[in-house]
From Swiss-Prot:
Amino acids binding [4Fe-4S] cluster: C280, C283, C315, E322
EC number: 1.17.7.3
Ranges for region Disordered: 371-392
Recorded metabolic or biological pathway in which this protein acts: Isoprenoid biosynthesis; isopentenyl diphosphate biosynthesis via DXP pathway; isopentenyl diphosphate from 1-deoxy-D-xylulose 5-phosphate: step 5/6
Presence of the UniProt keyword ATP-binding in the record: no
Organism: Mycobacterium leprae (strain TN)
Family the entry assigns: Belongs to the IspG family.
Protein name, entry field: 4-hydroxy-3-methylbut-2-en-1-yl diphosphate synthase (flavodoxin)
Cofactor binding description: Binds 1 [4Fe-4S] cluster.
GO biological process terms, semicolon-separated: isopentenyl diphosphate biosynthetic process, methylerythritol 4-phosphate pathway; terpenoid biosynthetic process
Length: 392
């Protein structure tokens, strides 16, 4: 009997092209489809504590934050905005709820943008004209930030709860009011704690407008839960070309949000990769403590921005092959580790020296990339892939 196996299916396509949006500037950071997707976070300091706020902004900047947001619930916070905006190395957005007067305070202070929550600012619709005029005069954008937890009562009454349709209708209604006053320097967010609702809302929004979109799963939770929720939601949207800025909301220090956000973008090849550690889940074949080895190598290379592929392998099944394919790697077994550089074994070291040796060799490769191959090589390597550390 003849069997027709047919032709193999074509592989699934890669990421969709970026959704075409209007372009805007948040300080010196471009936002929109012509620009790299930016990563944001929000200070957890009291904004009126200028020193503490600037210190946290400096930490976020070092971690790779592109844009930072600060709260402004009180007049003393508004009074501090000018100094914060003046000394911050990255653009400062002011987050406004309840009191419209703080919108104008933020604009007057020279902040790079203002986020407004139309669901809880008093009589906001009637103040849109004033806000549009002030923002236009200052040349700054407005983010219309709709949130499931504070949805405009009109849309809550209409839909019964914060559905994706309710979030989108609220955002587009407010945007239309700004447009009536000739102001289109707008970006939008429609955040929900449920990634499924959030994804649906952004997909609907993307189909109905060309505003840049700021992605976020609101109240995502502690680090593990929030990372999973954000990665799932952002991956679903970014793979379709939807999203121009992101914030990973975590119940954790803000620097953790930046680490996760950057890693999400790197994993989708939407940002040049730094080093990456690929490690297996371990099994009964492993002849070293894979978890300990992977964590120690990761900690030792923390902050390394050069794209190196580093393989840390725990057994002989995939170890030698993975190590040979990497820029740098180790295949471990019998209390020893074979160190590979560019596919060649350069030495064998005792297990206790594996981490130290890998870090030394990584630094040597970084030095060679800078002095012998030049910045063009680094740029090309960054585009083609990331430094990968593989632990099997």
């Amino acid at each position: 009997m003849n069997m027709r196996l047919g032709m193999p299916e074509a592989p699934a396509p890669g990421l969709a092209p970026r959704r075409i949006t209007r372009q805007l500037m948040v300080g010196n950071v471009g936002v929109g489809s012509d620009h790299q997707i930016s990563v944001q976070s929000m200070c957890i300091t009291k904004t009126h504590d200028v020193n503490a706020t600037l210190q946290q902004i400096a930490e976020l900047t070092t971690a790779g934050c592109d844009i930072v947001r600060v709260a402004c619930p009180r007049q003393e916070d508004a009074d501090a905005l000018a100094e914060i905006a003046r000394h911050s190395k990255i653009p400062v957005i002011v987050d406004i709820h309840f009191q419209p007067k703080y919108i104008f305070a933020a604009i007057d202070a020279g902040c790079a943008a203002v986020r407004v929550n139309p669901g809880n600012i008093k009589e906001f619709d009637g103040r849109v004209g004033e806000v549009a005029k002030a923002a236009a005069a200052a040349g700054i954008p407005i983010r219309i930030g709709v949130n499931a937890g504070s949805l405009d009562k009109r849309f809550m009454d209409k839909y019964g709860k914060a559905t994706s349709e309710a979030l989108v209708e609220s955002a587009l209604w407010e945007a239309s009011l700004f447009e009536e006053h000739g102001f289109g320097n707008i970006k939008i967010s429609v955040k929900h704690h449920d990634p499924v609702v959030m994804v649906a809302a952004y997909e609907q929004l993307a189909a109905q407008c060309d505003y840049p979109l700021h992605l976020g799963v609101t109240e995502a939770g502690p680090v593990f839960q929030g990372t999973v929720k954000s990665a799932v939601a952002f991956g679903a949207l970014l793979s379709k070309g939807i999203g121009d800025t992101i914030r990973v909301s975590l119940s954790a220090p803000p620097v953790e949000e930046i680490k996760v956000g950057n890693q999400i973008l790197e994993s989708l090849n939407l940002r040049p990769r730094s080093h990456e550690i690929v490690s297996c889940p371990s099994c009964g074949r492993a002849q070293v403590d894979v978890y300990k080895l992977a964590n120690e190598v990761s900690a030792g290379l923390d902050g390394l921005e050069v794209p190196l592929r580093i393989a840390v392998m725990g057994c002989v099944v995939n170890g030698p092959g993975e190590a040979r394919d990497a820029d740098l790697g180790v295949a471990s077994g019998n209390g020893k580790g074979q160190i590979f550089v560019k596919g060649e074994v350069i030495k064998t070291v005792p297990e206790a020296q594996i981490v130290e040796t890998l870090i030394e060799e990584a630094m040597r490769l970084v030095s060679e990339m800078g002095t012998e191959k030049g910045s063009d090589h680094c740029s090309e390597t960054t585009r083609s892939g990331s430094p990968v550390v593989t632990v099997n």
